[in-house]
A protein has these predicted regions:
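Short, hydrophobic alpha-helical packing/hinge segments within bilobed ligand-binding/sensory domains
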Residues: 10-13, 122-123, 145
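Short, conserved clusters of charged catalytic residues that mark active-site
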Residues: 11, 47, 140
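Structural signature of the Rossmann-like NAD(P)-dependent dehydrogenase/reductase core
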Residues: 3, 29, 85-88, 158-161
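Solvent-exposed loop/turn segments at secondary-structure junctions
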Residues: 7-8, 32-36, 61-62, 70-71, ...
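Early extracytoplasmic/lumenal segment of secretory-pathway proteins
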Residues: 1-14
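C-terminal lobe and pocket-closing loops
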Residues: 145-190
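Hinge/capping helix and adjacent helix->loop/strand transition within the periplasmic-binding protein
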Residues: 15-26, 38-133, 181-190
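Paired acidic/hydrophobic, glycine-rich loop segments that form the ligand-binding mouth/hinge
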Residues: 23-30, 131-138, 155-158
Length: 190
C-alpha cells in the first residue's frame, strides 16, 4: 500500500492509472475528491474511473455543526437569518463541493465559502469564531467535534445520513439525534 500525497489525490491516481497492471493485483482506493475531480472535468485527471470495477464501498458520512452561540441543536433558523455564513472549502474540486448545493437547498442564502482551508485549518478557524459552519467525516467528528459538543461549545445541525442498499437514508449512530439531510430538507422546505 502506498499513498502519494499532493494534488487532491490526482497525483497518486494518475500514477496508478499509468503503472498498474490490469491483472487484479492492484487496488485503487479513492476518496470523494478523486471522483469530484472527474465529475468537474479537471484537466489534470488522467484516470478513467469507468474502467475500474468497484469491489468494496465504505459508507462515509458528513456531520454538519456550528457553535452553540449561533444556533440550537438541529435548528437552522438562526443560521438562515444571518446575512453572512462562512464555511471552509478546501478547493473548488474537493469533496466539499457538494456543501454549496446542500446550503442552497436548505435556503442558507448567506452561505459563502472560504476556499483554500484544509479540513484542519477550517476547523481551527471555526473554533476561533472566524467560520460559522463546519463539517467533518466520522473519524474527525468523534475525535475533535464530540468533545466540543460535550463541553457545550458546539451543536450538531445534521448529518448526510447513511444510505442503505435499498436507497433509504437512516440516521448516523454516531449522532442518533441529529437529523439526516433529507429530514432537514423536509423540515426546512416542507
Amino acid at each position: 500500500i502506498r499513498h502519494i500525497p499532493g494534488g487532491g489525490a490526482i497525483k497518486g491516481s494518475n500514477k496508478l492509472e499509468k503503472n498498474a497492471k490490469a491483472d487484479g493485483t492492484f487496488i485503487f482506493g479513492c476518496s470523494t475528491s478523486v471522483i469530484v475531480n472527474v465529475a468537474t472535468g479537471n484537466p489534470l485527471v488522467k484516470y478513467n474511473l469507468s474502467e475500474y470495477r468497484p469491489v468494496v464501498l465504505l459508507p462515509q458520512n458528513t456531520h454538519w455543526f456550528t457553535r452553540s452561540d449561533l444556533a440550537e441543536p438541529h435548528d437552522l433558523s438562526k443560521i438562515k437569518e444571518r446575512k453572512l455564513v462562512l464555511y471552509a472549502l478546501k478547493t473548488p474540486a474537493s469533496a466539499d463541493l457538494f456543501h454549496i448545493w446542500i446550503y442552497e437547498k436548505l435556503g442558507i442564502k448567506g452561505a459563502k465559502p472560504i476556499p483554500g482551508l484544509s479540513s484542519s485549518g477550517g476547523y481551527q478557524a471555526f473554533l476561533r469564531g472566524e467560520i460559522h459552519l463546519s463539517s467533518h467525516g466520522a473519524a474527525n467528528y468523534v475525535k475533535k467535534v464530540k468533545p466540543e459538543i460535550e463541553k457545550g461549545k458546539v451543536v450538531d445541525l445534521m448529518t448526510l445520513g447513511i444510505i442503505g442498499a435499498d436507497g433509504s437514508v437512516s440516521r448516523n449512530p454516531l449522532a442518533p439525534n441529529a437529523p439526516t439531510f433529507p429530514e432537514m430538507y423536509e423540515k426546512v422546505n416542507g
